[in-house]
Amino acid sequence: MEEEEKNNNEVASPTEQNTESTTEQQPQLPVKITSESKIIVYFKNAGGAQPLKQKKFKIQANVSFQNVIDKLRGQLKLKSNESLFLFINQVFQPSPDEILGELYKCFSHNDQLIINYSLQMAWG
């Protein structure tokens, strides 16, 4: 009888057990993004596009995706008539008016937003 009471005292309550098991399974919540925040954007080349010397940039969270397109065009020294295709995580092609901070909230990985770029249609 004493042994049963001892075992009962050592057993954690169901809420404690649930907390421990769910903590390991839940993804880490993203950092709160404000309009003044800067986001780490990581550019990955694909489809024969030249790689950038500097692949990571800190960009304001409140800018449109068009600003990112313009920045990348400048880095690649592309003419206005040359095609450039950008995808988030190789899957999603945002519209130019999307806000970078919102894209980060939805698609960031390891505290950075990965943007794949190509001079030809590579995904989609």
UniProtKB/Swiss-Prot annotation:
GO biological process, any: glycophagy
Region annotation (Disordered) ranges: 1-31
Biased composition (Low complexity): 13-28
Entry-linked InterPro entries: Atg12, Ubiquitin-like_domsf
Claim: Transport is one of the keywords in the record: yes
Molecular function via GO: protein tag activity
Subcellular location(s) per record: Cytoplasm
Gene3D superfamilies tied to this protein: Phosphatidylinositol 3-kinase Catalytic Subunit, Chain A, domain 1
One Gene Ontology cellular component: autophagosome membrane
Cited Pfam families: APG12 (PF04110)
Covalent cross-link site, Glycyl lysine isopeptide (Gly-Lys) (interchain with K-187 in atg5): 124
Alphabetized UniProt keyword annotations: Autophagy, Cytoplasm, Isopeptide bond, Protein transport, Transport, Ubl conjugation pathway
Signal peptide from the UniProt entry: none
Record carries keyword Glycosyltransferase: no
Family: Belongs to the ATG12 family.
Stated role: Ubiquitin-like protein involved in autophagy vesicles formation. Required for atg8 association to the vesicle membranes. Conjugated to atg5 through a ubiquitin-like conjugating system involving also atg7 as an E1-like activating enzyme is essential for its function.
Database matches in PANTHER family: AUTOPHAGY PROTEIN 12, UBIQUITIN-LIKE PROTEIN ATG12
Name the record gives this protein: Ubiquitin-like protein atg12
Source organism of this protein record: Dictyostelium discoideum (Social amoeba)
